[in-house]
Amino acid sequence: MGRILFLIFAVLLLAFSSGVHLSCQNDIPVQHEKPQGPRGFVPIADKESTVRVLIVGSAQDVLLAVNGGYQIADTASNILEQGQLLARSKVSVDYGGIRIGGKCYKVNELRIKSTRDGAIEINNVPYRGCVCLSQQPDNKLFVIEEMEIEDFVTGVVGSEMPHLWNDEAHCAQAVAVRTYTMYKKKARRSEKYHLDMQDLAYRGMAGESPRLSSLVQKTKGLVMTYNGNIFPAYFHSACGGHTEDVSHVFRDESIPPLSGVVCKYCGNSKYAKWKRDISKSVIERKLRAANVAVSNIRSIKTLDPGYGNHGSRVEIVSAGGSKEMGANDFRLLVGPNILCSTAFIAKSSGKNITFSGNGWGHGVGLCQHGAQTMAKKGFKWPDIINYYYPKSELVRVY
């Protein structure tokens, strides 16, 4: 009997030490599924450190110059010409080829590369890396820059934020830009380019400085994720008191990092409150150019305001009746530098509409003026990231 009891005790001890559950409810192992990211967001798989950016789209011609050694090649990397200091030349599409100055290359795509780190100038703006000139079916030109992501991030940070702002604000902005860039690169991996000039403010090398390059290097390769998926880390100038849920503005699926937060830090911005008088005829002309038929506007109002009072839609009442359209679409048509945000109240005043609103930009993600205030108060860049993108995680991808 003693031997049997000893064996039973030994079996029980082995079971507990192995973590085996002995209750009837737990005798079947539970299969834990890997959390799935929201629809539309993508896992990080592409760790290549280059990105393609459309810097000129559908142009009749552009001006090209290279301040140093250069090569002109076709898509198969065959060198068609090389030399030193390519003088400023007009580039256009010409009879089934691409003409640079007085010479026509019978190809529909050319790659211009600086061989000694010189700048490639397009329309007098300096760029890095490699520039692709691409003929489109309508005989217009696309100009695409291919460069290192970190160089692109530096150029965007210097274009999006004043150079004299706080280091920690710049570092937070760099992480947001890199995350957005990697997301777009993954989402558009099969396209000719990953981003265009409407995605982010970008002025090539003109946005760079040694200080900004050093700050960007502090966060090199770091991006934000949620549930293991990279997401579009939107940012804007000033939210006016509360950032918006991404689903409210862009119809992307809502996730905690983009669900909106109270912002206590941009109230002193000159964009916290604003007022604009815009001619009704100007608004009507811009809407008609986008095939939105309106005449004699009587009233404009936002519908379905979000946490930050940014409207989801806009109702326009005119002589022809009532029309609705996306609030962000309306703002972009009128002019994003004229109509600062979609968080506004509009009043008809004779020939004008008076818009009174809060904030500058779409209101999603990082509030740049809020980030600057946080940095001045002593917050570090990870604090800023955690504040504006709650529950996000930092991952180094390269």
What kind of region is each of these model predictions?
Residues G2-Y398:
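Conserved, single-site charged/polar hotspot
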